[in-house]
Amino acid sequence: MSARLFSVDSDSQRIEHFDDGIFLLRGFANSTELMAQVRIVCASAPLRHMTVPGGKQMSVAMSNCGPLGWTSDSSGYRYSATDPRTGNSWPAMPDAFMSLATRAATAAGFRNFKPDACLINEYQSKAKLSLHQDRDECDFTQPIVSVSMGADAVFQFGGLRRNDAKKSLLLQDGDVLVWGGPARLRYHGVGPPLADCRTGAALRVNLTLRNAA
């Protein structure tokens, strides 16, 4: 494991206890090196806009790596060992992703986390994810690890019911968000990437690592 994949500066690696079961690790990831691995994965399993069961196309472009990949189509939401576009296995999960996820989960108090699925989301312009629960996994005792790269975005946590009050936090490049325990089934979503005030660029990539099986 390369130490360069993680920030060791205590000023940039602040662990914030956002709420019960929710932890934010500021500047924990080296997005430059992680993005190099994302490009390799997406060369084998290109990003695509999946459809939800109702037929609407998602604004977020997605791909997967690891033994299992999350997919959505007219048949519903599910994990699959193969890419439905090609019938091939998803690309192997890079060691860098696995190492980052297990280290972040441990830092947040969730030991023995072993992700078998990594969803790659690309947010361009107005792309966003509305409030939802992650309920397609088999073991809800396992946390979720979310890695932000690129443009800033506002992440929201609701409660265990869709209409519960929401709390917001700003996610920035290199931030890692971990939630589990009492927060595992909380509704959550993320807004569109925020444009850089200097360049106008608004591109965000996110890794979501889970234990799905």
Predicted features by range, described:
Residues 1-213:
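Non-heme Fe(II) oxygenase metal-center motifs and adjacent flexible, charged/small-residue loops
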